[in-house]
Regions:
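Aromatic-rich peripheral "rim/lid" segments of glycoside hydrolase catalytic domains that contact
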Residues: 270-327, 339, 659-661
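Beta-strand-rich binding/interaction modules
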Residues: 319-360, 369-373, 384-393, 770-776
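Helical hinge/lid and interdomain linker segments adjacent to catalytic or ligand-binding clefts
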Residues: 418-509, 599-600, 606, 612-621
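Catalytic beta-strand/loop cores that center a nucleophilic Ser/Cys/Thr
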Residues: 517-624, 641-647, 652-666
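Short beta-strands within extracellular/lumenal beta-sheet-rich domains
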Residues: 720-757, 792
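N-terminal carbohydrate-binding accessory modules
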Residues: 1-41, 58, 406-416
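Substrate-binding/catalytic cleft of secreted carbohydrate-active enzymes
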Residues: 31-286
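A glycine-rich, often tryptophan-bearing local segment used as a flexible ligand/cofactor-contacting loop or short
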Residues: 465-560, 625, 629-631
């Protein structure tokens, strides 16, 4: 793009008032618009999307805020099946209704003809033909602005701009998927030279209190679990806001850095919720910006210093790599000259432990520059969180500042492993053997499984499956059933015989780095932000959840090289959606709805099998967190503690409160799904009523609206029996018509011997009576009828000796399970 003859990169924001729930008289006023626009300009945003409100457009003209605008959604007179049939009538409507109101305003720089219309098959062809024809006519009317034909999905085939909507790192994939944008030819139409924009991305729709907004019957609840998992509710808000800012930072800075490789990358406009408060505010100051809003101020600095660092966890005394990038989008169009970078690795008190200065060459306007760094961490550095900080100075003035987080493990990080059971290993490659030797863990090697004792622990090293002797699985299963423990470190499970296991394990195949759209699979084989389902498990001793987000790369990757960094903690996860979880302890999981399993232990006979998807031994000597997890895994496996598929409970379980659930319900596997409840602002309660649909989803007025009504927040409120169900690749729940009659779900717990009663609190949020059946193990079910709009606590006597209970719910999917207590 060019503005006044000079190239310009578009630093945008896509979700803005008006029509977002703010009191109409306020949000349409010139004063409010000016305060809002000035705040965004202060955060270095230079383009926004707004509807056709003249006060807002006048303010954008006055404040120098560019606008991209037009028709969002279907054009007028279109239907869900086809575009408008009268082309010239549609063109006139564009001129008068959709684009015309913006035309007199110099701030308007891009026209949009439609948003996310069909793009494949015959419907897609029809839409492409219509939009191409409309564009051809409209440029006769105004050829001074470029056009987006089908925003998000059209990929530039019907107008001027190659526009994309991708929610990598929210609905699907991860922020690493942005690395695909370095391949310019993959993002162009043959024979065309087009500017590339992302006019929607990032997502991460946080609500009023910072937690993700779990809008019913949408993709939001599943995405929440992918990124903040089963953190306690009181920590969900902080974690969601932090990840939202992380995602915005990486999307915007990578997009700008990648111009070195793909000069057609021209603008990015995250579609995310930047403010806490909307409904009922009296002025702009009451909106309260979120951390993501302030992140714009850093990542959208006209002259950007940006850190590229793929080694997040470092051991004291080691050397790690990073790359410093500079992107010069100076608002005055000036070259960057006579400048230098001062950088430092700072501790929590902002005291540098390492620092240096890097002189900068002349960097022309709209140019980029980078240099690698090798940073040596002093050996006496204590364990903790550290910050890489860089500052560009020009003639003594600060031009740009940016930071990057680094975790350093000090001398006291590692703890010795003291096995109480003999450790045997099968390790053809030798990496695991070396790890054990370096950590003084006693072991013996074997290539035969005939002579194993029931006290032994048998570890199969990473990627060794193809080298196992014949009939190994039969021998390993027999060994486990006698009381042995098998530890299977990560394998290419799609190439592995899994039939010998006592439960069904389904391999995953596609990487989250794959940019195919729509996503071909729901759960990828690799992932970040791993969720420790059993947070008190010995395997996670000394490893907080944030240390399971990303691990250090071991391939010496940087963005000048093809491919992707090896930073996913899990690279070979698997599915347990058809497994009986009374036999399996899910220790860690990941992905949307936590459907992917990273680590589990399967009971069989008197012993067990541990399946692992973590990428561990490749990081020996590189990532102290991966090393600690592997040490903990070996320490647990060679100890006396047994798996706990039946979670021991001696407290009241508040369903939907993850700290109370303590990993009893693991996500996609038990059939008990979170029940989101909308909290409606006081000024909207007369207009928006809570509706319950036939599948039990509760919503305020209508489905969705997480972006148009950000002041309505959906929060966890119990769980509902929802199986059988599946997910679409896009991320929505899918229930077949043949399965709609009733839902099912279960949980497995072990209770104290003194308990003789089970108290279950159930809610019926509907206008009519509903039925639900409660069962325990193989004992007869008990039927309950819940009156309309009632909350009832029902009592079930435990007049049997079993202390390990599989509790099942069967019946109306609209039933809400609120609490369970054993007394």
């Amino acid at each position: 793009f060019y503005l006044n003859v000079k190239p310009i990169f578009l630093r945008g924001n896509a979700i803005n008032p008006p029509r977002r729930g703010i009191p109409p008289a306020l949000e349409t006023s010139r004063e409010f618009a000016r305060d809002y626009i000035r705040f965004l300009r202060g955060m270095n945003v230079n383009i926004i999307r707004i509807p056709d409100n003249q006060n807002w457009m006048d303010v954008c003209d006055e404040e120098g805020m560019m606008v991209f605008a037009g028709r969002y959604g279907r054009p007028r007179n279109a239907t869900s099946n086809q575009p408008p049939q009268d082309l010239m009538q549609a063109v006139e409507l564009y001129k008068k209704k959709e684009l015309g109101p913006f035309t007199p305003h110099p701030s308007t720089v891009i026209y949009v003809l439609a948003n996310e219309m069909p793009f494949s098959n015959e419907r897609g062809k029809a839409w492409q033909q219509f939009l191409s024809a409309a564009h051809k006519e409209l440029i006769k009317w105004d050829d001074t602005r470029p056009y987006i034909g089908n925003a998000g999905y059209g990929l530039g085939r019907s107008a001027d701009i190659y526009d994309v909507h991708r929610y990598w790192g929210w609905y699907y994939n991860t922020f690493l998927t942005y690395l695909n944008l370095r391949d310019m030819n993959a993002w162009q139409n043959e024979g065309k030279v087009q500017a590339i924009t992302f006019t929607e991305c990032v997502g991460n729709y946080t609500g009023i209190d910072g937690r993700y907004n779990l809008c019913s019957r949408t993709k939001q609840p599943g995405s929440q679990k992918c990124w903040t998992g089963h953190l306690p509710n009181e920590r969900q808000g902080e974690a969601a806001l932090e990840y939202q800012a992380f995602m915005l930072k990486n999307a915007t800075e990578m997009f700008r850095r990648f111009r070195t490789h793909n000069p057609r990358l021209a603008g990015i406009m995250p579609f995310t919720i930047l403010f806490h408060n909307w409904d009922g505010i009296r002025n702009f100051a009451q909106m309260r910006p979120k951390p993501a809003a302030y992140q714009y101020g850093i990542s959208y600095q006209p002259v950007l210093l940006s850190w590229e660092s793929w080694q997040m966890n470092v051991r004291a005394g080691n050397v790690f790599s990073s790359v410093l990038h500079v992107v010069n989008d100076d608002d005055q169009g000036r070259d960057l000259t006579d400048a230098r970078i001062v950088w430092a690795l700072e501790d929590i008190n902002r005291i540098p432990i390492v620092s240096d200065t890097v002189p900068l060459p002349k960097i022309p306007y709209y140019g980029t520059w980078s240099t690698p760094l090798r940073i040596a961490v002093p050996t006496d550095t204590p364990t903790g969180e550290y910050t890489l900080k860089g500052t560009i100075l020009q003639s003594g003035k600060i031009v740009s500042v940016n930071t990057c987080d680094i975790f350093i493990a000090g001398e006291t990080w590692s703890e010795p492993v003291q096995p109480t059971r003999p450790l045997k290993i099968f390790d053809p490659q030798g990496d695991f053997r070396t790890f054990l030797q370096e950590n003084d863990i006693p072991f013996s090697e074997t290539t035969s499984f005939d002579q194993l004792s029931k006290r032994d622990v048998m570890v199969l090293s990473e990627m060794c499956w193809s080298k196992l002797p014949p009939e190994s699985t039969t021998k390993l299963l027999r060994f486990a059933e006698r009381g042995g423990r098998v530890v299977c470190l990560r394998q290419s499970y799609e190439k592995t015989d899994l039939a010998w296991l006592p439960v069904k394990v389904i391999p995953t195949v596609l990487s989250a780095n794959d940019s195919s759209y729509p996503p071909p699979v729901y759960t990828y084989r690799d992932g970040m932000n791993i969720n420790p389902e059993r947070t008190d498990h010995p395997i996670f001793k000394g490893i907080p959840r944030q240390r399971l987000m990303l691990w250090s790369d071991y391939t010496d990757f940087d963005e000048s090289k093809p491919g992707f960094p090896a930073v996913y903690p899990v690279t070979h996860g698997f599915l347990l959606k058809e497994a009986d979880l009374t036999q399996v302890e899910v220790i860690a999981n990941y992905g949307r709805n936590l459907a992917g399993t990273a680590l589990c232990e399967i009971e069989t006979g008197k012993g067990s099998v541990i399946l692992c998807g973590f990428d561990l031994t490749s990081r020996r000597g590189i990532d102290p967190v991966a090393e600690k997890l592997l040490s903990n895994l070996i320490g647990y496996a060679t100890g006396e503690q047994k798996p706990e598929p039946y979670r021991f409970v001696n407290h009241e379980i508040v369903w939907g409160d993850f700290s109370s659930e303590r990993g009893i319900v693991t996500g996609a596997n038990n059939g008990l799904t979170i029940n989101p409840l909308p909290i409606i602002p006081i000024d909207q309660q007369e207009r928006l009523k809570i509706v319950v649909d036939d599948l039990g989803f509760q919503y305020a007025g209508s489905y969705g609206r997480w972006n148009t009504k950000p002041g309505v927040q959906y929060i966890p409120h119990g769980r509902r029996p929802f199986a059988p169900f599946d997910y679409t690749p896009g991320g929505s729940d899918k229930v077949e018509n043949s399965d709609r009659a009733e839902g099912r779900g279960y949980f497995a717990v072990e209770i104290p011997s003194s308990c003789s009663r089970m108290l279950t609190t159930l809610e019926n949020p509907t206008d009519g009576p509903i039925k639900i059946f409660l069962g325990i193990n193989e004992h007869p079910e008990t039927e309950y009828t819940l009156p309309p709009h009632s909350v009832q606590t029902v009592e079930r006597p435990l007049s049997f000796p079993e202390r390990k209970l599989k509790v099942t719910l069967r019946g109306d999917r609209r039933t809400v399970l609120l609490r369970t207590q054993f007394k």
